[in-house]
Amino acid sequence: MNNSEDPFQQVVKDTKEQLNRINNYITRHNTAGDDDQEEEIQDILKDVEETIVDLDRSIIVMKRDENEDVSGREAQVKNIKQQLDALKLRFDRRIQESTQTTIPLEETVENSTLNTSMAENNDGGMSNPFQEQMLREQDVHLDGIHKTMQNLHIQAQTMGDELENQGQLLDNMDEGMDGVVNKLARGRRQLEWVYEKNKEKYDDCCIGLLIVVLIVLLVLAFIA
């Protein structure tokens, strides 16, 4: 199966893209933004954590197949976990640095209003549309991850059903072999019974044939 067709690889790819987006956002914004943006980032990080749990579960299912090599998949999930831990550390540090900065309330409101006005004048009002576009793209990626995880769940269920069917097939084969062995044993006992029943009669026939042969030989000897 190609990576483009593998649901596992698709989830890994989407998850890495989400982490890269958050990393780029944190890199561009050294300080914490408004509450909505920070909450959105926290939600994405939680979604990534849940995705990692689902990936670990899918690896456990794949390990049941002895022919499946999951070492590469385990390395990919480990790399994602490391990226997530690093981003969470950077995110928490930004929050702490933001809360430690004490600015009078009036000055904060005044500066915020001034900065907002300047940003609107310099950027031509593109800040909010850019944020909305980023959020829409994140929603699309999350929907893709959700659908891919559903496919992984369906595949895991299918593999479980196949293993269960194979177990039932082996049980049926064992029962069939037991039936064949029992039939062979009954046939052997019947043959032994027939042999014992007719053994004396067969012995008498053999003795009679030997007597006839001896008489014929004696007659031929006298004639000669």
Curated annotation (Swiss-Prot):
Subunit structure, interactors included: Interacts in a SNARE-pin with the SNAREs TLG2 (Qa), VTI1 (Qb), and SNC1 or SNC2 (R). Interacts with VPS51 of the VFT (or GARP) complex.
Residues with a covalently attached lipid (S-palmitoyl cysteine): C205, C206
PANTHER family per record: HL02043P, SYNTAXIN
Native source species: Saccharomyces cerevisiae (strain ATCC 204508 / S288c) (Baker's yeast)
Modification after translation, per record: Phosphorylated at Thr-31 by TPK1 and dephosphorylated by SIT4. Palmitoylated by SWF1, which prevents its recognition and ubiquitination by TUL1 and its subsequent degradation.
Coiled-coil ranges from the UniProt annotation: 35-101
Family affiliation: Belongs to the syntaxin family.
Domain t-SNARE coiled-coil homology span(s) in chain numbering: 132-194
One Gene Ontology term from the biological process aspect of the record: Golgi vesicle fusion to target membrane
Record region (Interaction with VPS51): 1-106
Cross-link (Glycyl lysine isopeptide (Lys-Gly) (interchain with G-Cter in ubiquitin)): K183
Keyword list, A-Z: Coiled coil, Endosome, Golgi apparatus, Isopeptide bond, Lipoprotein, Membrane, Palmitate, Phosphoprotein, Protein transport, Transmembrane, Transmembrane helix, Transport, Ubl conjugation
Cytoplasmic side: 1-203
Modified residues (Phosphothreonine): T31
Membrane topology of this protein: Single-pass type IV membrane protein
Function: SNARE protein (of Qc type) involved in membrane fusion probably in retrograde traffic of cytosolic double-membrane vesicles derived from both, early and possibly late endosomes/PVC (prevacuolar compartment) back to the trans-Golgi network (TGN or late Golgi). It has been reported to function both as a (target membrane) t-SNARE and as a (vesicle) v-SNARE. Upon vesicle tethering to the target membrane, which requires additional proteins, a SNARE-pin is formed.
Compartment annotation: Golgi apparatus, trans-Golgi network membrane; Early endosome membrane; Late endosome membrane
Protein name (Swiss-Prot/TrEMBL): t-SNARE affecting a late Golgi compartment protein 1
Record-linked Gene3D superfamilies: 1.20.5.110, 1.20.58.90
This protein's record includes keyword Transmembrane: yes
Regions crossing the membrane: 204-224
